[in-house]
Every structure is written in C-alpha cells, then in structure tokens.
A protein has these predicted regions:
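A broadly conserved sequence feature marking short terminus-proximal activation segments
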Residues: 1-35
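Canonical Radical SAM [4Fe-4S] cluster-binding loop centered on the CxxxCxxC motif
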Residues: 18, 22-29, 37-80
Length: 153
C-alpha cells in the first residue's frame, strides 16, 4: 500500500473501532422517491437496514465510503432485523418498486441471513411489489443467493 494511504487507512480503522450508539431495532433510513418501472414513473420505497455492514470494509479497512458509520460491529440479530422490517413496511406498502440497502451486501449471508432475506422477499411479493433493487458486492451474485421461496419477479 502506498505510504500516503496508510494514515487514511489507520484513521478509518480507528473510526470503525469506536462504538456507536445505534438503535438496533430501527433502520438507518427510509423514504419514498420516484423511479421508472416499465417506462412508467412510479413511487419507490427505499430502505437502509442496519447491519454489520460491508465485509470488505471489515476485512481490509476499506476507506472508499463512510457508510461504516451506520453499521454495527458484530452485526444485528435476526430479531432486530425483523423489528427493523416492521418499521419499514409502511414505506413499501402500495409501492411497485422497492430498493433495499444495507451499507454492505444484502445477499451476503453473513450480513443478512438468507432466511430473513427469504421472508422479506416473500413479504414484498405479498405486498404487490413488482421489482426489488438490492445492494451487493459482485462476489455474492450467484443463483444460491437468489433461491427465494416467493419473490417479486
């Protein structure tokens, strides 16, 4: 690593080691914005679930973004993820499009357990959501991470 980057990496790693007092049962954020779906402008529900965050940031001390500030070292329990989901459902209800972010990778099973992801995909399908955009690093994109029981098409 070039010497000029060492102080930045050290700063980022030190910042990540400082505990933050985040409510584990509340998402980072939720809002509604316009999006295009099949050539039509629709309302999209956007949510950022609080998780342990990006494994690359944890593993290598990545300094590309500051999203680690919204994460929880050690992760969030399945029960707390479900509590967060209860709080974001009203933002998604009645929408055709959903965007799910985690400040990491939604389909990294060590960040978001597959069982939880499967539950919420089914819930979004039941709500009538037609399209879901998720955040992920490319190394997690494979068929086993998309083997949901019931998901929007």
């Amino acid at each position: 690593m070039p010497e000029a980057f060492v102080p930045l990496t050290d700063f980022v790693n030190e910042s990540k080691s400082t505990p933050r007092d985040h409510p584990l049962d509340k998402p980072v954020a939720k809002w509604v914005e316009e999006e295009v779906l099949d050539g039509e402008i629709v309302e999209a529900g956007v949510v950022i679930l609080r998780t342990r965050g990006c494994y690359w940031s944890i593993k290598e001390g990545c300094s590309m973004c500051g999203y680690f500030n919204d994460t929880v070292p050690g992760g969030v329990s399945d029960d707390m993820l479900r509590e967060q989901w209860k709080k974001v459902r009203p933002t998604l209800r009645g929408k055709k499009y959903a965007k799910i972010y985690t400040s990491g990778s939604f389909i990294d099973p060590t960040e978001v357990p597959f069982e939880f992801a499967d539950e919420i995909m089914s819930d979004m399908s039941d709500m009538g959501i037609e399209k879901v955009l998720i955040e992920s690093l490319p190394e997690f994109v494979n068929s086993k991470h998309f083997a949901y029981t019931n998901a929007p098409k």
